[in-house]
Each structure stands twice: as structure tokens, then as C-alpha cells.
């Protein structure tokens, strides 16, 4: 990208950006929630739309001069509705967490009971963690996975729901490698007359391309981020049934946000447009293929995969049998140029700052052009680094750098 002005006005900051640019260029990015946006997304993000205040919604703003940003937001909303066949869309949430907060606030009262997936079983902070606003403002009860299969125990979920009769059931996860049965959860919600919310932040790209069943026909509310598998700018969005549209929109503005970030909404419109193209479907198909191959190769090296494998874009790995913690594995792999994150596993025995596992995913490396052969090499690099962690691993670091050079991040930047 062109940094001519920044070079002249703030070389100190530019130096930091350049160092991060180099890190992204020469590291294998396996954090499941990260991806690389297109240059078009970044151009929209860096546009003069950042100058415009636009409190309110298109054609009902509290400021003048909004006729063109109205067009931008309308375009983003229409593309998002088309992408997921939804009745209503709100593209103003600054993040997935704020999208979730707005849904809770739209139909619930403080102190209401909500059923959400346990964080250590693959849920998310905003699904009821006691350190998060969700756990502080609402009475969250957790469900999780079966100890044997390590997949969601729907019978137990139903039992907990019948015993506690929550006002809402939240599904979706941040570290769950299997298909989620939204129809089954809808049936449980209907039995207890509860709202159904799905946080599809991680799997939105899979849903958009038919690689994971869509929650939209079943859920009252669906939230997502725009920067994971959707490959857009950092931000959030909400889809809902038309009957909840006013309540959701009011919860975002004036409920928890003021002016929307119009440059980000423009970038969201770009990413939704990209996701509607055929080449995006091919990309997501390759993500799933890559994840399966990476998982099988790691199993061949003796790594234990939670639930035995994957149906989506991520793998959750139990490192107990490798005699290394998630924290140490993250640091070790980072030293050779592979970026992962430590992650709790179901029925975790260690602290969330240490963890028994790591979470990895293939969306970012697939964006670069990595395919099955590269997945086999990544599995080899990971295994070799962990098995020979007391040795000099400079040759692995060099091999990783060479692979990254073959697949430059932004060839035309």
C-alpha cells in the first residue's frame, strides 16, 4: 500500500506498520479467527467516508449531508440480506460482541436467564462468561459437549433448558469444529417458548456458501463478525426476522452506539459483494479441504484432535500427550513463524492462561493460496518443532519463510 503521507508525517508509526507487514508476510497464520482482506476492502476502509457522521439509519439521520453514505449503508444491508436470505440486516455494530449485546438488549431484561455454550467447551466470552458484560448483566446457564464424543450434547441441552426455562438460547461457538444442529435447537426453543440466537461469527463464510447449514431459517436473531471467514473489515452485523427489526435497530442506535463507522460499513459492503461471487465459494471449499487434510496429517503425527476431527475451518488440538502446554506451544511455534493461539479444551484442567490445547484454522493461509500439499508441510513443521523443541529450529523457520515467499500476501500492493 502507498504510505507516502505517513512516511513524511509519522515515520515512527509507519515503522511499526512495516514490522507488522513483514510479520504477516513471512509467517504462516493459523489463528482460526484471522484472515487477510482484499485490497478493495482496505481501500474502502481508508476512504474519506471516515469523515462523515451519520447517526441514525439511512433516510432517517440526525445529521445533514448523508445522502451518499445512505446509499453505502443501503448497499451493505441489501448485499448482506441477499448473501444469507435474511429478512432484516443491521450493519452498524462495531464488533461481534456489540452485535450480541444489542440482541440481548432488544428483547431481554437485565437478570433474565439465558442458556449459552460454556467458554471452555468452545463458546464465547459474550455467551455468559462471568468476566464479560453478558455474565454480569444476565443470568447465564451453560451447556457443553459430551465427555466421550466431545460434540454438543443436545439431550443434556434440552434437559437444562426444560429445568431452567431460559428466555433465550444462544448457539454458535469460537472453538467448536463440528456442524451445529440449528433445527434441533429451534425445536428446544419452541418447547420452552424461548428466543433463539445464533452467533455464527466463525462459520459465516461456510454458511454463505452452503458448507454449513444456515441458522437463518431457524433463529430469531443471527449475529456475525465480518472479518473471519467472511474476509472483510473488523466489525459486526445482525440478521433477524422482520418483526424484531425495530427492536434490534433501536438497541444498536441509540442503545449502545452513536455514529456508525461509515468507512467500515463501506468495506463491509465490499466484502459482502466479494462473498456473493463464485470464486469465494471455491475459496471456502478449499478452506474445508485444507482443514481436513491438516487435521488428518496431525493425527498421523499423534496429535489428538478434539471430537476426532473437523467439519469446518478449525481444529482444536489437545496437546496433553505431547507434554507441552498451549501457552508453550504458542510461543514455540511463533518462534519458527507459525502463529496459533493457546485454547482451553473441554473439561480443561489448566488455567485459561496456560491451557492444554491450541486452536488452529486455515482461512488465512487459504487466502494466500495454500492447498493440500502445503497443509502436509505445515503439519510436519508443527510436529517437528514440538518434538525437537530443545534443538535449534532455524532450518524450520527458513523453510517456512520460503513457502511464504511463494505465496505473497498482496502481489499488486
Swiss-Prot record:
The modification N6-(pyridoxal phosphate)lysine is found at residue 228. Its EC number is 2.1.2.1. Gene3D superfamilies: Aspartate Aminotransferase, domain 1 (3.90.1150.10), Type I PLP-dependent aspartate aminotransferase-like (Major domain) (3.40.640.10). It comes from the Bacteria. Catalyzes the reversible interconversion of serine and glycine with tetrahydrofolate (THF) serving as the one-carbon carrier. This reaction serves as the major source of one-carbon groups required for the biosynthesis of purines, thymidylate, methionine, and other important biomolecules. Also exhibits THF-independent aldolase activity toward beta-hydroxyamino acids, producing glycine and aldehydes, via a retro-aldol mechanism. Homodimer. Belongs to the SHMT family. This is Serine hydroxymethyltransferase. It comes from Clostridium botulinum (strain Kyoto / Type A2).
